[in-house]
């Protein structure tokens, strides 16, 4: 299989066909597409984000454009601090944000990947994460599952 990930959820059939045609030069494998589906933002204690407070996004991922776009469409993002992928966070990186968060002025949001590295620094302060999953279209999911079932029953 050739799987194009992080596609727009509304990728048109004509756009998919363009990708399939270009891929055909290199492989006859079936071409599938995934899109990102975001879950509800929660902190490490299970509390939902306050929709009335602005958020500060902190990331250390290769390309944070999708999460930025999503958050800007749905929330009041008043700060974005982006670091290089695999950044080794230090308390000094986010000290001003921690002070604003403690004062109840902002909520710090990050990816699930970055949460692992940021939680020890925040020392019990709320840190919100935006869960994300890759999803196949119903047709692509059926094709993949049918093929897998066929392989497993052989």
Language model segments and positions:
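C-terminal accessory "lid"/substrate-recognition subdomains
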Residues: 1-107
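Short, polar loop motifs at secondary-structure junctions
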Residues: 64, 112-116
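Short conserved micro-motifs at the rims of enzyme active sites and ligand-binding pockets
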Residues: 70, 120-121, 141
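Short glycine-rich, flexible loops that bind phosphorylated cofactors or substrates
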Residues: 11, 116-118
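A short, gly/pro- and small-residue-rich
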Residues: 20-23, 75, 118-136
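Conserved active-site loop/cleft motifs that coordinate metal ions or position small ligands
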Residues: 107-112, 128-131
């Amino acid at each position: 299989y050739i799987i194009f990930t992080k596609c727009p959820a509304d990728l048109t059939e004509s756009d998919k066909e363009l990708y399939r045609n270009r891929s055909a030069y290199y492989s006859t494998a079936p071409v599938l597409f995934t899109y990102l589906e975001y879950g509800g933002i929660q902190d490490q204690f299970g509390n939902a984000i306050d929709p009335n407070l602005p958020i500060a996004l902190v990331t250390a991922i290769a390309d944070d454009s999708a999460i930025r776009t999503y958050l800007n469409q749905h929330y009041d993002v008043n700060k974005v601090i982006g670091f290089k992928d695999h950044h080794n966070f230090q308390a000094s990186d986010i000290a001003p944000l921690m002070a604003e968060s403690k004062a109840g002025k902002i909520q710090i949001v990050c990816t699930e990947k970055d949460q692992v590295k940021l939680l020890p620094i925040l020392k019990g302060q709320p840190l919100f994460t935006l869960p994300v999953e890759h999803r196949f279209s119903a047709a692509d999911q059926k094709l993949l599952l049918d093929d897998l079932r066929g392989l497993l029953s052989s």
